[in-house]
Amino acid sequence: MAIINMSALDLQGKRVLIREDLNVPVSNGVVTSDARLRASLPTIKLALEKGAAVMVMSHLGRPTEGEYNSEFSMQPVVDYLEKALDCPVRLAKDYLDGVEANVGEVVVFENVRFNVGEKKNDEALAKKLAALCDVYVMDAFGTAHRAQASTHGVGLYAPVACAGPLLAGELEALGKAMDNPARPLVAIVGGSKVSTKLTVLESLSGIVDQLVVGGGIANTFIAAAGHNVGKSLYEADLIDEAKRLVANAQSRGGDIPVPTDVVVASEFSPTASATLKAVDQVADEDMIFDIGPDSAEALAEILKNAGTIVWNGPVGVFEFDQFGEGTKRIAQAIADSSAFSIAGGGDTLAAVDKYDIADKVSYISTGGGAFLEFLEGKELPAVAMLESRGE
């Protein structure tokens, strides 16, 4: 279905309201990680170049809805954008009943979550936002899975609703990875719990050629294979589920490989002493914190031969270097692979940064929850809204 792309529109003299994901960490009034801000800059710059009066809105943190709280103010974002855009940028605190916006400047709305009804997608709030603009641009993939007033409702009532370049690029990359992927398609799903990623694992096991599990999730699969996991984080109640997923994958000619060697310790701490063990030698007091080098090499070989790689989640506690070798090897293998690769999710992006492979990954997704819901095959409300407005 055709979604209108902002890049194709004439915006000269138009009031353009862009919903970005500018939810960044702030400490003492200063932005401490600017990845999302950097990702939004090309869209804002393009709207300025096209001669628009640009308004930008986003949420930041989780304030109590309807209450102003300076801790969650957009002011640090305004300060950052003013330096990055080299044009006047100002904060609008009260904007719902009208706001002055001029060509050549950027007006940043105060945190949308200070508005009562934002999360519930309140119709009256959505209509007020829509009345502020000639063109509404949804560019926040990170919140595309939420039907809220600033991400969904406003687009139903704005004169024109379109996708910004960041969102359009995200959908194109995800489509390339999932709709018609170059085979073999390999997915790496890490993280601590099977329960939080069960639907993703279900969905992926039906379409990928090889599903690789890591982190705490892998421990449940190790237990399902009949091995002792000691005191490791795992979910005993999901062992049958893990067995079923493996059987499903194998019936399709795929597999969910279980590590053959693991790195264990007796405590979870930055100074814990790491010990390498065969997977069938794990003792009752051991905790598994990483895959071993043999397992990492086997996975690297799978990645080397892949046509498409989807990476969501590390395979070990990589924050501690002694348990980071598995994730480091996976990161290196993805960097070296000729496959189309897409990485998403907070921990994954931290690993991409730590091992300095950002320029070797084909596409880095800005979405966490939205990335997972896309992988699950769910319809994203904001995308559905844009499709309905594009017809």
UniProtKB/Swiss-Prot annotation:
Molecular functions per Gene Ontology: ADP binding; ATP binding; phosphoglycerate kinase activity
Pfam families per the UniProt record, alphabetical: PGK (PF00162)
Top-rank EC class of the record's enzyme: transferase
Keyword Phosphoprotein set for record: no
Reactions performed catalytically: (2R)-3-phosphoglycerate + ATP = (2R)-3-phospho-glyceroyl phosphate + ADP
InterPro entries per record: Phosphoglycerate_kinase, Phosphoglycerate_kinase_CS, Phosphoglycerate_kinase_N, Phosphoglycerate_kinase_sf
GO cellular component terms, semicolon-separated: cytosol
Protein's UniProt keywords contain Membrane: no
Pathway(s) this gene product operates in, as recorded in its UniProt entry: Carbohydrate degradation; glycolysis; pyruvate from D-glyceraldehyde 3-phosphate: step 2/5
Subcellular location as annotated: Cytoplasm
EC number annotated for this UniProt entry: 2.7.2.3
Superkingdom in the source lineage: Bacteria
Residues that coordinate or bind ATP: 197, 319, 345-348
Similarity comment text for this entry: Belongs to the phosphoglycerate kinase family.
Subunit architecture: Monomer.
UniProt name for this protein: Phosphoglycerate kinase
Taxonomic placement: Bacteria, Pseudomonadati, Pseudomonadota, Gammaproteobacteria, Alteromonadales
Encoding gene (name): pgk
